[in-house]
Amino acid sequence: MMFRSEANIPSVPRLASTLSAATRAAAGRFRRDQSGVTAIEFGAVAAPFFALLFAIIETALTLWTTQVLETGVGNASRRIYTGQFQQDNAATDPTLIAGKFRDEICKSIVALITCDKIQIDVRTLASFPGQKPQKPITADGQFDSANFGKYEPPGANQIVVVRAAVEYPVFVSLLNPNQSNLQNGNRLIMGTAAFRTEPFAQ
């Protein structure tokens, strides 16, 4: 019968040292292994990055659309300012005049805004500092369509406030809460022009 010599059996300290060295070697290989790191890091930052990028683009489009609407209102209001629009539509049904003026605004608007969604409000005021039009948004964040959308035919030498409003969709309001001003999450974009009409012949 043969017996294994105890000299061939590693001692406990030697075994622990061997295992520790193997563990350190494996840990070193793990640290040096860079495969898949980029994909993991990109996956961690991709969602917030693209959300922020989209929010920036959406804010820029909103500002651009607002400027486009302002330009359209300014260009169309010149015809009211000179009295040409009133004279050209003297025989037009009063219920259709607002639509006619909206068509004038749409001549200066690119495809950013759907023209048939634009609401028009034209009011005459007794004085500039003494009066101002009612806000088009109610206290609970609704578009006040009941009081917005009237057309008061401006005469000569009258103070006129022309407003156009359209709802613009907002998709990333969580990143920019101030982007939305309506309860449904959309933003009411407005274009305004205030002036005194010329003393045109009536």
Model-derived features: positions:
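Short, conserved structural patches
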Residues: 2-14, 75-202
